[in-house]
Amino acid sequence: IEESIRKGTGTYQYGNGESYEGKWVNGTKEGQGKMFYADGSCYDGDWVCSKRHGKGKVVFRNGDQFEGNFRDDKMEGKGTYTFADRRVYTGEFKENKIEGEGVMTLPNGDKYQGKFVGGVPDGKGLYSFSEGNEKFDGVWEGGKMKNGQFYFKNGDIYNGDWKDNKMDGNGMYIFMNSEKYEGEWSEGFKHGKGKMTF
């Protein structure tokens, strides 16, 4: 067997310090294999034509981990990403990014379930707080609340516009005692024209 054509199962050490343990077919990584990268990360899973493709797991140098589907050497499809800071995302990925429908659970127990774009909530989603049964159900933009209903732990409900995660714009606030304010808001406070119903 010529040295340049690797086949079967074995270990290959690259000149840059990287190494591969697994199956070879006609000189390419094919099937199950484990790759240790120069940046300190490690991939263990399926290979097709020397690219990560299929099921696999990556452990990154910073402690982050991903387990799920790969396509053409990138995280693609369904998977679970566990951050070093203990945030856990389970859902869809596109070209190595959190993209699509998924669930993000924070270390404090807060949970967001809905649409993600570029790794942050964007689109329709439900954010549930771990304490007090508070939640926001509505539309997100760039990781911030944009429009929807917020349910407060005391029973109050706000339905309307948001800016920088504060009530801002037009909205209706229904108090637990059935009193209601409908009108304009600014930075979390009633501001401008509005109507109070007792």
Question: Where are the predicted features?
Answer:
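Glycine/tyrosine- and acidic-biased, solvent-exposed loop/turn segments at the edges of beta-strands
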Residues: 1-198
